[in-house]
Amino acid sequence: MQSLGFENKDRYDDRDVVITNLIDSYGRLIEFGQKHLNDLFVLDGIVNVNARDRILREIVSNTLAHRDYSSGYPAKMIIDDEKITVENSNLAHGLGALDLQKFEPFPKNPAISKVFREIGLADELGSGMRNTYKYTQLYSGQNPLFEEGDIFRTIIPLKKIATQKVGGENVPRNVPRMSSEELKSKIFEMIKKG
């Protein structure tokens, strides 16, 4: 599986070619996503949740558990500033965009799905799509897209802040700075006044 991170649309800025067992593949893909996506402050009701990691868990486990391993098509996870796109070869059970309300889950690799459920990398069949919808709406305010065909495609829309890097052009320049002595003096003055 290839993981690609883009800042410049003309070339990828980071790449991880993952050729290992399913468990290690899962870990590397999650880490790649965490490296390129910010953990935004997201509330589910009154509880702060890590929507980024929950989305990654669902799309990575779905890709690994439902991929057609007899195909030579390389699975991909591409992260750019607008979306995450995951593609994998597929034994199609239908064609076109999947509708959450009409979706009927179909196990493509039941043995892999069962192992993933047993070790906690996936939940019951079909819950991944519901969870991805829920956490994508919390993370980006939009709906994900699932397209079934010979290539299964998952598209997770992103807010600009989800991929912004700290530093560089985002840091103001020429900001007046105080020496530590000046800062200490200012703090003491404020304490005396307070």
Residue ranges and their predicted role:
Residues 1-194:
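C-terminal regulatory or interaction extensions
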